[in-house]
Amino acid sequence: MSRDDVQRWKDKYLENIEQQERLQRRWDARIDLLRRGLVRSSLAAEGSDKAVDQCMKELREILRRDDMDAGLSGLIPRLEKAVLDSEQRRQQRTQQNIDALGELAQQLLALDLPRELRKPLKQFARDIEERARQSREIPILLSELSRLQRQALAERKGGDAEDGRPSLLQRLFGGKESETAAEPSASVPSVVAASNTPIQPAAAAPSLPVAEHDEAPGGPPQPLPASRVAAIESAPAGWVGVAERGEPNQILLDEPREIWLDSLPLPAGLSFSETLEDAGAESPPAVPADVESAPEAPATPVDNLDGQAVDEAYELPPPIPEPGYSAVAPHIEASLLRLLDGLSLPSSHQPQAEALRERIDGSLNWYELVPVLDDLAVLVLSLADSGQRDFEEYLRQLNERLESFLGHLGDAHAGYTDVLDNARGFDQSLREQVSGLQASVQQATDLNSLKLAVDSRLNGLLASMDEHQREQAEHEQEVSGRLQALMERVNSMEQDAKAFHSHLEDQRQKALTDPLTGLPNRAALSERLEQEVARRHRDGGDLLLAVLDIDHFKRINDDFGHLAGDKVLKIIAGELRKRLRQADFIARFGGEEFVVLLPATSLEAGRQLLERLRAAIAACPFHFKGEPLSITCSAGITAFEGNEAGEVVFERADQALYRAKRAGRDRLEVA
C-alpha cells in the first residue's frame, strides 16, 4: 500500500471519528433538550391530580439520572393508568359542575320572574350542557349566572317591597329561616359595640339565608336590618355569608369562618373606629397584619419632593408604614386594572375580562381579592393557551400553503411532461409527413401528380406546425399563470414568516430582560456567558467576571420602603450601564446583585474599571426629604483560567464578593 493510500485512509478515519463526535454531541444535546422539555412539561402538568403529580415527580427524578431506561419502563405504565384515572375524575367533576349549574338555573327559573329575565335564564340553562364541557367556559358561565342571579334578586326585591309576597330567601330555604329572620334583634351599633372580637356563628339552623343587597355599590352605608343580624347570629358553624360589597353574595363552605366587624355595613355616621373606642377593646388579633396593623394613610408619591434644592432624580420616597387594606386598595386596583388592560385577550374572553374589570373597579375588598386573583390567573392561562392555539393555527396555515406550493410544483412538472409529449408528437408528425413526401416523390409518374402530392404533404406539415404552436402558446400561458400564483404565495409566506420571526424575537427579548431595571436578566446572563466562554476557548484572550452587590440594601427597603429600593436599583443600573463599553455585558442576577462580563480585558484594567463603577455609585446624590443618603456597593472580580466553566468562575467571584462584605463592605476583592 502506497504512502498516499495510507494517508488517504488515515484522513478518512480521522474524518469519520470527527463526524462521530459531532453526531454524539448532537445526540447528547437532543437528549438534554428532551430532558428539559419533559421536566418543564411535568411541572406544567402538576396541580390537577395527586397521582399524576407523584408520577411527574418520579419522572423528574428519573430524568436527572444517567440511566433512564429502567426507571422509565417501570414508570410509564403507572403514568398511563394515572392519566386515564385523572381523566375519568375530570369528567366526573365536569358532570358535577354541569349538574350544579343546572340546578341553580332551575331554582331561578322556579321563581316568578318577568319574561325578559326568564328568556336569558332558559337560554343559559340550555347552553350549560355544551359549554361546561370546556373548562375555560366555567368562569364565563359563573359570571353569567352571577349577573342573572343579581338581576333576579333585584327583581324579587322590588316585587317583595310592592306586594309583600314571600321573599326569595323564604321561597328558596323554607319557613324556618323566615321565622328566624322575623325575630327581633338589636341594632347594628349595639352589636358592634358589644364586642371587638369576630362574630362567631351561634345556634345551628338548617341552612343559611343568603343576604340580599340592601345598598347600591358605592352608596353610603345603611343600617343593618334586624332580620339580617338575626340571620347572621343563627347561621350554622360551617356556613358564613361573606359581607356584601356591591357584588353577589358568596357562601363559603367546608370550614368554619369568622365575620369581622369591619366587613359588615354600618349605619351612616358611625365608623368602625368609633365603635371600637366605645367598646374599649383592641383590634381583632386574627386580622392579617398587612390589613389592620397601621393607620390608613395615602402613599406619598415617589417623586414628591418637599421643595428642597436637591436633585429630583435621586430623591427617595418617604417610608410608608404597613397600611390597612383601604389605604392600599386603590394601588392594588390600579395595578390589577393595568395588568388586565395589558392582556391581549381573544374575543371569546372579553366578556369575562369586562366582568372582572367591573369587580375590580371601585368595589374590591379584602375578602374578594383572592377570588379576583384566581379569575385573573385563569385569564392569563387562557391567554397562554390562546397563544399556543395561534401558533398551532399558524403551523396549520403554513402546512396548507406548503401543500399548495407542492401542488403547484406538481402541476408545473405535469406541464413540463406535456411539453415533452407535445414535442415528441410534433417530431413524429414531421417525420411522417417527410416520409410520405419522399414516398410520393418516388411513386410519382408525372409532374402533375407529383405537384399534388407535394402540396398535400406541405399542407399537412403546416397544419402540424400550427397545432404545435397553438398548444405551445396555451401551455406557456398556463405555466405563466401558475408561476405568478406561486410567486405570490411564496411572497405571502415570506411576509408571514418575517412577521412571526419578529414576534418571536420580541417575546424572546422580553423574556431575557429584567422588567424593573431594563438590564438583561439571569437567563440572558447564562446565554451570554456560554457564548463568551465558547469564544474564549476558540480564539483565546482574556475574560473577566465581576459580581457587584449593593451594601445594606435590605436596610433601604426596611427604612424607606420597597418603592425607594426599586428606585435605587433602577438608578444604579443606569449608572453601571452607561459606564461600560459596548463589548461589555451587565445583567441583574437577582435582588440587589449584578454580574458584569468584561471580554478582552486584563485583570488590572478590570480592577480599575470596577473601582470607577464603585466610585460612581458612591457619588450618586441620593437623598431622602432633602437629607443626603450614602449608598455604596461591594464587588468581587476574577479572570477565567484555562478551560474553566462559567459556573466555577462565578463561584470564585462570588466568594471574593463575600470576602469584601466581611472585610467591611464598600470595597473590591480580586480572586
From Swiss-Prot:
Q: Which cofactor does it need?
A: Mg(2+)
Taxonomy, superkingdom: Bacteria
Q: In which pathway does it act?
A: Purine metabolism; 3',5'-cyclic di-GMP biosynthesis
Gene3D superfamilies registered for this protein in UniProt: 3.30.70.270
Enumerate the subcellular locations listed in this protein's record, separating them with semicolons: Cell inner membrane
Molecular function via GO: diguanylate cyclase activity; GTP binding; metal ion binding
- Name the InterPro entries for this protein: DGCcoil, Diguanylate_Cyclase, GGDEF_dom, Nucleotide_cyclase, Rev_trsase/Diguanyl_cyclase
Chain residues that bind substrate:
N557, H562, D566
Q: In this UniProt entry, which residues are annotated as the site Transition state stabilizer?
A: K554
Q: Which amino acid positions bind Mg(2+), per UniProt?
A: D549, E592
Q: Where is the active site?
A: E592
Instruction: Look up the record and report any one GO term of the cellular component aspect.
Output: plasma membrane
Family matches, as SMART domains: GGDEF
Give the protein's recorded name.
Answer: Diguanylate cyclase DgcP
Gene it is expressed from: dgcP
